[in-house]
Amino acid sequence: MTLQEQIMKALHVQPVIDPKVEIRKRVDFLKDYVKKTGAKGFVLGISGGQDSTLAGRLAQLAVEEIRNEGGNATFIAVRLPYKVQKDEDDAQLALQFIQADQSTAFDIASTVDAFSNQYENLLGESLTDFNKGNVKARIRMVTQYAIGGQKGLLVIGTDHAAEAVTGFFTKFGDGGADLLPLTGLTKRQGRALLQELGADERLYLKMPTADLLDEKPGQADETELGITYDQLDDYLEGKAVPADVAEKIEKRYTVSEHKRQVPASMFDDWWK
């Protein structure tokens, strides 16, 4: 088995999918998991990007079906901007599409800035822009878990195969969640699910960005990665990609393995 095939298997990628079938499977997963855990529903941060839009709509469909079947579940969508988000219109469009039971907004700026100032005062140096970006992601995680803990809700994560293969998420930030309904999907497959669900094309054709950096606001994921999502998707779907691209992907996969595992102990062998 080639490394490409090993990665596809590890990340549960299917080269060809039926969007209707995938939607059904993922809604059922959300329903089954919330019932099994005894939780009261879900909470998810909504950025206005493709991934949170898709996960949010799946979550809302799941809780509606649970209620229609005589159960009780709620979905809360939470906006988590840092000051003014330049694509706020997209976030509002996403909320209109998702139609969450409840939605709220929590500006993380005062929390992030207070932490950054305290860090500088105590340690005598400023956080790098990259590290501050990770703090933003982790404050967002803390906020979602505060809401979830207060209301008995599970935190949904938006990680999918194209992020997982590169480790393109913040450890214990956007990587911190209770369940991952998008696991196994490539970026283009996620777009196909949104199309099937009737989303405005603006929500899945926009340039993907983590938007965590103050010095490079709105920087494209592809710029930061040095790899395009089409290349990642082709690789994950078992297609041929240029040798240098495959090498980049495989290197990122190897060095980011710790992000896809629980914290290492001396009894684990995945890190050896």
Curated annotation (Swiss-Prot):
Q: Which UniProt keywords apply?
A: ATP-binding, Ligase, Magnesium, Metal-binding, NAD, Nucleotide-binding
Matching SUPFAM superfamilies, A to Z?
Answer: Adenine nucleotide alpha hydrolases-like
Provide the residue positions that the database annotates as binding deamido-NAD(+).
Answer: R138, K171, D178, H258, K259
Annotated positions binding Mg(2+): D51, E163
BP GO terms, sorted: NAD biosynthetic process
Which transformation does this protein catalyse, written as a reaction? Answer: deamido-NAD(+) + NH4(+) + ATP = AMP + diphosphate + NAD(+) + H(+)
Q: What does this protein do?
A: Catalyzes the ATP-dependent amidation of deamido-NAD to form NAD. Uses ammonia as a nitrogen source.
Q: How does it assemble?
A: Homodimer.
Which protein is depicted? NH(3)-dependent NAD(+) synthetase
Per the UniProt record, the lineage of the source organism begins with:
Bacteria, Bacillati, Bacillota, Bacilli, Bacillales
